[in-house]
Every structure is written in structure tokens, then in C-alpha cells.
């Protein structure tokens, strides 16, 4: 049944958020201290940082690696501390990576190696990482071009696939107290065949917001991410803007991933002693008006996600975190409670107190750097749970949970820069779903957690090798079993966008139920860094999907080559 929209509440929330933000910005000069913008999310970049923490054999006091992105200042401080104490940068490749991290955030390292030997036309690229830069006591500015030009062949398409992205990245500081970041990119792309096929069922471009059709089978979309950043005190950092968040130490996240599009957020992070506490409020799209021809005109219905995560370092090797997240309706005044805006409270208690029907997820995560070169990690997400129903073994539909376990093994068999990661993910049917678009765990019709949604098992293996300082080789693969719906009216619990009140049965639900879909995905990539942050990539992708549903019974091979400049690799790994 369609809910009557009452935008008063959404306007009220926006009103108070704006007043809070204006107050903070107006007041910050009274107490703000030096701060730092983030290093953009990039699995290759972040792997180096995680690698050195594992190699050191103890947790990084400067970083709580479960919360991503990391701040540039913290990255440099941690890298410098390792260079002085642990000698973890022992190989040529590790020493290159250390210098890369310092050069990429030279405003914090002041590394002599960040200077270009021959600036372009005297004024450009005085620093290896920046086209233009301003380095004054009251103003710091970094401007870099962004390019992603890729061309490939998909075995199921006659025409080539490609990506053509042009953009700019800007970051800086004002008075060393307030930071700012902006990324803008214009894209035209012909997507892989299996991604194009998915648009028929869910007409949104993975990772993106508004899009339109380009030529016969392409897509055109604009990317924009931006935020302001400042430290309220030495230990409290705040950010406001539009970007992504990743929670976890795995390749996937079952809590908060970077798969969905960026969203408007207000974030407060407290890091003190051995404790890190994050509160974040996100505004996301509950649904969109889209067809295979592109996104329709808004405005779209809005919902909010209030999220907090607390973690503590126990000893020098073990980190334990607890989280709670509530998805609530911003277009109805019937069941919103302003207590959701309280950054230090248990949302489940609010539900019990006021009888709320909002969707609350709770759970835990951990990381254990057991010995040098070996780390274990995991996540547990509880969407709904009744112990007696679990004990009965009757497959009650509302026993909704997700589990992740993994390990990272650094310098495998004593071979420098050969790293292995293994991971398993299990998600029960109907997890992340709700009886309303305003309660499911999604943004712009895309999962906020795992890209496969729910009702699946998955195994992942990743091997990374850096035989030469500028050469990175990655072999990545996953095998997943997911239960699909036989038709649009059926609901086996794998599509988190479907109303879970339309479930096929209250009992007898098992992981992978419905029409079974087996996916084998292999990605072999070699990347060579020609200049700082300028890469040439060669890639081979093999994807085999077996199902009784013809649309999902496909075999795809893709070969491609790309030039990347100041941007992470783009993937459709599902």
C-alpha cells in the first residue's frame, strides 16, 4: 500500500541538520586544531597500509582500520613510525610504497622526494602528486586531473566495452583548521554484458546515482563527491558532505560498504586512548523512478540511516567493535523519534520504548593480528533474531543475520610482497529487507552492504604480488551460491528491495533457497605505475553464471586495457 507522503518531517530533519552544521562551522575557530582530509577509498592503496600493520605485528595506534576512509595525516604518521621502529619496509617494493604514501600526502610528510625533478612549464607539477599546488601558512591547495580511459572486449557483445572518465580532484586546508575535498567526474561507458543484463531487472548503474542512456547500449553519468572536515578538539573530528564509508577489514563489508552510491552524511569521530567511536547520519534515496532508458525525474523519497560504531584495542593485537544502525522514514511523521539523532544511545532501546517499526541492525566485528604476517578478521550482523526459533531449527524467516570470516597472510612462504587473503560470507534470506522501501538497507535501489544482497554463501580468494616497485599483480576470485526468485511476484529472500511481507513462507527458509544461481568470478590484473598515480592496467575477467533461469545462465570473458590517473580501478565484482 502506498504511504501518504508528509514532507514536514524530512524538512524538519534537514532544518535541524543545517542549523547544527552552521553552528559547528561558526564555532570551530574557537577550538579547532590542525586536521586532515581523507585518502579516497581505493583497495590497492589501502592494502598497503593494512599490509604494514600486519607486518608490524601489532595494531596501529594512529589508525582504527575498521573505519574507512583513513585520514592522510594519520597515514603519514603511521608510516613514519614504522620506518623508525620496525623496519617493515625491507624490500625495494616496500620502500617504494613508503615513499609513495609520503609523497601522496606531502603536506604532512614534507618529504624531499615529493618534489618533481623537472616541473612542467615551471609552474605545473612542482610536486609529483599535484598539477597545481598552493603551500602557504593560511592556505593549502592541491589540484589534480582525473582520467580513466579503458577499452575492452566482452565475449557476449559485438561492440567493444569502454569507460571514458574525465574529471578533477581538489583538496586543501584553510588556516590549517578546516579541510575541504571535491571530486567531479563526467563519464560515458559501455558496461559489461552481465551488468547490462542486470539493468533490465533493476535499472540503476552500479555505484552511481542519476544516469541517462548513451548511444544504443551505453550509459552516461556524472560523479560528485565533496566534504568539509575539521577537528573540534584534538580527539574529535567532524565531516559533512557527500561520499562513501566502508566499515570492516574484509574485501566485502556486511555492515557498510562502498558498493552503493555516495550519500549525504554528517559524521563525528572520537578517537581517544584505545577507543574509537563513530556516529554518522546518512540521507539516502528510498526508491528511484528509473527505466532501462535512464533515471527519471525526482524528487525521490528520502530515508535516513543513523549509524554508530564503537571499537576498542585490547592489548596490542586485538580490536573489537560493536555497531548499531537504524533505517528510518523521513517522509512520514508516524514513527520517527528525534532520539535517533542522539549520537550516543542504543537504537534498539528506542524501538522497544516507543514501539517503532523502523529497521535496526546490530552486530560486532573484530580484527586479530595474531602474529607478524598473519591477521584474522570477521563481522556479525543481526537484523532480527529469536533464540527459541533458532533452537527449533524450523527456518523461521525472521532469523535474519550475516556472518563474515577471513584472514590475511603477508609475505607468503617468506616471499617478499606476496600476500594472500581468504574470506567467507554467509547471509540469511530476508536479511537487510523490510516491509517498506523506507526500511530496507539500500540507497538508490542498491545494497548498502554486500552487492549480492541476501540469501547466499560466498568464498573469496585474493593473491597480490608486487615483484617490482611499480608493478602490482592481482589474482582475485570468488564463488557464490545465491537463491533467486522464479518470478517478479515471488520472494525467496534474496532481493532486499522486495517487501518481506510477501515472503513465500514463515518457516522452512534456508540459505540459497529458490532458483539456485552459482557464480564463479576470476579477475587477473597487472598494473604498472608510469608516474605518480598514473597507471596502465591490463585485465582478464572470466565470469560463469549457472542457473535454471535463462537470464542468469551466462558465460562471459572480458579482456581490457586502461589508463588511470588519480583514480581507483572500477569493478563490477558480483
Task: Give the location of each predicted region.
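Generic structural marker for isolated residues within well-ordered, non-membrane alpha-helices
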Residues: 49, 225, 460
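Outer-membrane beta-barrel channel domains
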Residues: 43, 58-66, 71-73, 78-319, ...
